[in-house]
Amino acid sequence: MQKERTIGTTTLKTPYIGMGTWAIGGGTWWGENDDALSIRTIEEAIDRGIVWFDTAPVYGIGHSENVVGKAIKQNRSRILLSTKCGLEWDHETPCFHKVMEGRNVYRDLSAAAIRKNLEDSLRRLQTDYIDIYYTHWQTPDFSLYPLEETMDTLLQLKKEGKIRAIGASNVTAKIIEKYCSLGQLDVIQEKYSLLDTHIADKLLPVCQKHHVSIQAYSPLEQGLLTGKVTQDTVLSPTDVRNKNKFWAQKSRLNILDVLQKLTPYTEKYSCSLSNLIIYLTAASLPDLHVLCGARKPEQIIDNVKTLSLNLEEADLSEMSQLFEQLRNSIR
């Protein structure tokens, strides 16, 4: 499997594994974090060849970007940095998103909001350009913030050299088509895992049509596919994973049974279960980029081992069939 992959029609190339930094933003969603440890984790990733680092203003209400900015300052030219626009907590809009970190967060993809979001991100990240700039969440009513205005602003920022590529997150096929009718969309970021492959049917065809890359988040289903979870694992009542249908007891039992069947492969390839899952995920769609979160250097060290794997086609096919059968059983 090809280790390096191009992003859309750009000249940007990166190993298929990137590092997600939502967790290092801390807060009520992820709990308290050690910023010094987070910085060491990012530095470890850079030293081990991870190129793409993804963040967003709303992760920890600016905290993730601040930590990432400190960590990459001496290595900015060696990495690709993506962040996002479109979620506001400083002012109210007619489009409420959700409460995050005790604040009301709203969607806003107007020209003024995008430019303000970018300048705030540049300051927190201590850089003068962003490699990939995503619209984080789309507004359901484009009469409120016309997509023409949004895309025109992004294209202008690209001309100004403040961003290098345009991305969109949490989209539909119709929205991708609309973006692409207005200019070049380079990449989308969507939830995707071996358990949740809905974008393969719904979004992949339109992405291939317009040469748009896909970056997957939550490939390990919030830790469920790491091998560290058992049927006896108990989540606290406030744990967000209670809302993940795959964590439900019945589904979890079937999932853990399949993971157990992968043990011979982890032994054959001398790798962790996470390595296998990330590899299988990256191999499941053409040119897929996989975003893996990490809070400790040892997690980075393990994730990077995936890039040295080279699974035999027969093994890849057998494991893919196991997950296809699993998906059919837990629908």
Language-model features: where?
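N-terminal binding-site loop/beta-alpha segment at the start of enzyme catalytic domains
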Residues: 1-80
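Acidic (Asp/Glu)-rich catalytic clusters
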Residues: 9, 71-76, 122-126, 179-183
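N-terminal small/glycine-rich loop or linker at the start of catalytic domains
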Residues: 10-29, 84-104, 134
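Residues at the N-termini of beta-strands
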Residues: 16, 52, 129-132, 165, ...
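Active-site mouth loops of central-metabolism enzymes
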Residues: 23-35, 100-115, 142-143
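Short, acidic/polar
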Residues: 32-45, 110-124, 171-178
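Active-site groove signature of glycoside hydrolases
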Residues: 122-141
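Beta/alpha (TIM)-barrel catalytic core signal, keyed to glycine-rich beta->alpha loops juxtaposed to Asp/Glu
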Residues: 138-331
